[in-house]
């Protein structure tokens, strides 16, 4: 606009001068009779016009200065706001990659133009080359409405464009225009390296090269543009040596064309020069005979003089502008020229290309594109993955609170697909090979994170189901176990069965829902084993729960029977008659038949059992009846031992009236002893086996050893095969009971012998011996009689001895005397020494020396180093596996294997005492034993308790 205004003012001044010359000529031709007044007016008008012109020129300069300043301010403001154009490479060859105050970076320029970033490959780049001050910037400004700086002729011919300037134009801002520094500037002189570098740079990124040529340079081989063309050809061969490399369109714009000279002639001359240059260009061997159109498409156009034919220039530029519209069928921007550099990666690509060019490295565009693709993909991966991590933070927070994340699968699948789609939408513009590689990397990173969250999700889910199982089944079990303490009512078990069914359905549905919603589609389900295991574990626990509920009902029925039968059975057991088991069977049959229908109705109606299972359980009822009878016998500790002892004492120690027997002199004790012992042994045989079948009455567990003729306890009767469920006491328990009974019987027998011996000794003492003892001890008797103290003490001792002798405890006196005599002199010395008596007088006895066992000398073998073994982390299902689920028999086994930390609440119960130790504890203590007898009993009990091998017998 400035040039047009100046031109307009100059033309106006020239017109005024011409008018003045015309007026002067007319004045000379006029005759002397001319009106001078008119002449003076004309002169005055001319002077006013000249003054106005002078003043106008001054004002015009002021206006120009103001406009320049306003333009600078406007450009600065525009640069800061929209960055329509920028200097991408300055005159020193520095790329705009650092945020400097005087210019923005290329990356910022692209970031500000968000529409351009989204274009992908759908944009075009054009650069213009040519001599300095050849009107390149002016042409671009008129052609693309850019605002590049143009030459100010008042300042003389100088370098206007410095380095490389870039502008973003077009309705969609899809055209990038690069204005390159002139090729023959005086400042560079003979330094052609910068010219060559920016030419190579434009070839690397631009699909169209405009070569600005003056018309008078056409045909002159030494013109600067010819060397420029040579550079372009050589550099293009250097860059694009692959068969599939894109072509480049070179548009020759011939400026200031001669209107008198046909354009076709100019074109043919220029084309001839181009072919000469192409023939002389050094080419690789593979392209020695390659024509120029293999690499370039050549287009030619011309424009009139800008100053002399400005209107025509503007008109033809408008026509030329249509060829740069992509919608035009004859557009210069054809897809075959596209260098396929994504819009969002253009800044990085140009930076890398210029860095290689500037450092004089071999420029490998495929490698640069691959490098760009890798960098941009890595950048995308980092950004997308950071966003991905922010979005999954919601899951991590939920997991940290030990809560399951609902709809885990949908959330992860949608998030994964969303992020992969975002990546592919942006990265698909780059090299397919690199994009696929980086897409796999991003996918792997996200799936690793999802997999980790999936493991946490499944662990929490399985623990949640385990807690549900434990809470549900154990709580329910505690309820129906508590029910057993109340009256037997099978209808109450209906509610427990319904609750258990509801628990099972609820837990199954919850687990199916959680497991279905927790397995993302894109990861490998490494919890299949745990899922299948937990499925079977849930079914197994339901099976155990149903079985335990049925067992609880049967146990309740057993206790019910036991409570009914106990008052009837205990008198029979205490009497221990021969027909005891016959009477027991009668009572059991009557009691069972009265309550069996109630049990059957409870199993069918309350527990919803089918007829086959009910029939099976009723067939097993015999086991519960046997168990009830067994519980009645064993609930009293030492019941059988007491019966045997009472039976033995009632026969051996008591008479028919139940009073203690008084033995007669020389009475045979063996007959009542063996009789009482035989009767007591029958009780042991009677209670060895629960005889619920009449055939069982024929079984006997005491036999005679044919070799020795002594009785022995056998494990199984010789006349049949027994049912192990009916065995009341094992062989070792029977041996223990018999040992205790044997010791008790022997103690009573020894006591009876002592009583009988005392009677015999008392009756055999002669009278003369008594008189002789009295005569010899007369002095002592008199001394005692004179001393009241000794007399009283003597009478007391005599009374005690008399009482002991009368009641059969004379053997205690013998035991005391034996104990006193058994104390050695060394023991007395030890006692005195410990009490501190006669410390200075009595020597301290030597302690007996004990031989220490010599340690075995071990071979000096080198010790192997300790192996540090890492403990295997417990599985989320603990020790439960598919293989051992079927072996689970109880909730305790199941929860122990599954590794549940929360112990279910159970009511305390008293375990049944061990029968063997119980039998040993309950050895009859009605008789008093001496120390030696007690040691004898303990030794025999220990021996008996160690006899626990099958089919082992013991003779007595």
Curated annotation (Swiss-Prot):
Record GO cellular component, one term: endoplasmic reticulum membrane
Location relative to the cell: Endoplasmic reticulum membrane
Lineage summary: Eukaryota, Amoebozoa, Evosea, Archamoebae, Mastigamoebida
Alphabetized UniProt keyword annotations: Coiled coil, Endoplasmic reticulum, GTP-binding, Hydrolase, Membrane, Nucleotide-binding, Transmembrane, Transmembrane helix
Residue stretches spanning the membrane: 765-785, 789-809
Stated role: Probable GTP-binding protein that may be involved in cell development.
Membrane topology: Multi-pass membrane protein
SUPFAM superfamilies tied to this protein: P-loop containing nucleoside triphosphate hydrolases
Family of the protein in this entry: Belongs to the TRAFAC class dynamin-like GTPase superfamily. GB1/RHD3 GTPase family. RHD3 subfamily.
Protein known as: Protein SEY1 homolog 1
Stored InterPro entries: G_GB1_RHD3_dom, P-loop_NTPase, RHD3/Sey1, Sey1/RHD3-like_3HB
Keyword Cytoplasm: no
